[in-house]
Every structure is written in structure tokens, then in C-alpha cells.
Amino acid sequence: MALPFSLLMALVVLSCHSSCSLGCDLPHTHSLGNTRVLMLLGQMRRISPFSCLKDRNDFGFPQEVFDGNQFRKPQAISAVHETIQQIFHLFSTDGSSAAWDESLLDKLYTGLYQQLTELEACLSQEVGVEETPLMNEDSLLAVRRYFQRITLYLQEKKYSPCAWEIVRAEIMRSFSSSTNLPQS
């Protein structure tokens, strides 16, 4: 009984540390939140990806939007914020709730919501420091088109279990690609 309590206390301390020390120390808090979300996405796997190889698709993840040296910190944070909003929306659809374990889905929503809250707090600090356009229109459109392609794919595949597995794996890949934010 002591081990689960110790583990719970460690998680509470980590959670408090990540949300209480948000003096826009985003790379650390963002990394912790990403780890939690990625673990949940991994736990959501219901079928073997190898049984879905025929359903693979290149959704055209806009990696250039997340290249740290192209944008300053507020723009990069804004791009990640848009991505997390789109992921939240994707997993909030009716088709999604039928495809996944409800408990894991609720935990995913909570993790994504926490990420959005931290990013919004950091964005408001960053924008107060420098007046920079948050995200240029081309980058915003690239992220939205990427998620539109994913949504169309799911519709074409009639939200099949394999289609959701391909999308889950794609979201894990793209989510982990968006974790490196510029320090300055």
C-alpha cells in the first residue's frame, strides 16, 4: 500500500511543480505534459499497427512549422497551441468516443487541456514582452490542413478501427515532433 501512495505523492509533486512554476519555463513544463499525453496515446492502442499496414497514409505533417530556428518563441508556442487544439478536437468527435476506452479518453482530454492552459499562460507573457504576430497565416493554414486531411481520411475509412489506429500513431509522431520549442 505504501508504494502506490508514494507514487501518487510523486505525481502530485511533479504536477504542482509543472503548473506552479510556469514563469514561462515552458520547455520543462511542456515536456512533462507531452510525456503524459504520449503515454496516454500509447495506452490507447487497441490493435496491432502491423494489422493495419494496408491503411497507412502520409498525412503530410507540416514539420517546417515547428522548426525552432524559423520562428521566435511566441510563434512556435502558438503553432504548438493550434496543434494541441486540433488534436483535442479530433479526439472529441463522436467517432472517437466510440473507438477508444472512455477512461483513457478522459485522461487524454485532461492532459491536452492542461497543455493548452500552460501554453496560453506562456503566450500571454510572451506577447506582453514583445509585439510579434503570434502565428503567420501560412503556418496556421498548414496545421489546419494537416488535421483536415486526417479527418477526411477517417471519414473515407468510415472511422474503422484500423483507421483510428493509423491516426493514433500519426498523432503520436506529430505530437512528439512539436516538443522542441526555441529557448529565446
UniProtKB/Swiss-Prot annotation:
An annotated Gene Ontology molecular function: cytokine activity
Keyword Ribonucleoprotein among record annotations: no
Family: Belongs to the alpha/beta interferon family.
CDD domains from the UniProt entry: IFab (cd00095)
InterPro entries referenced in this protein's UniProt entry, alphabetically: 4_helix_cytokine-like_core (IPR009079), Interferon_alpha/beta/delta (IPR000471)
Keyword Cell cycle applies: no
UniProt name for this protein: Interferon alpha-4
One Gene Ontology cellular component annotation held by this UniProt entry: extracellular space
Annotated signal sequence range: 1-23
Record-annotated membrane-spanning stretches: none
Pfam family, one: Interferon
Disulfide bonds: 24-122, 52-162
Main location: secreted
Function: Produced by macrophages, IFN-alpha have antiviral activities. Interferon stimulates the production of two enzymes: a protein kinase and an oligoadenylate synthetase.
Domain of life of the organism encoding this protein: Eukaryota
Keyword entries, A-Z: Antiviral defense, Cytokine, Disulfide bond, Secreted, Signal
Localisation per UniProt entry: Secreted
Gene Ontology terms describing biological process: adaptive immune response; B cell activation involved in immune response; defense response to virus; humoral immune response; natural killer cell activation involved in immune response; response to exogenous dsRNA; T cell activation involved in immune response; type I interferon-mediated signaling pathway
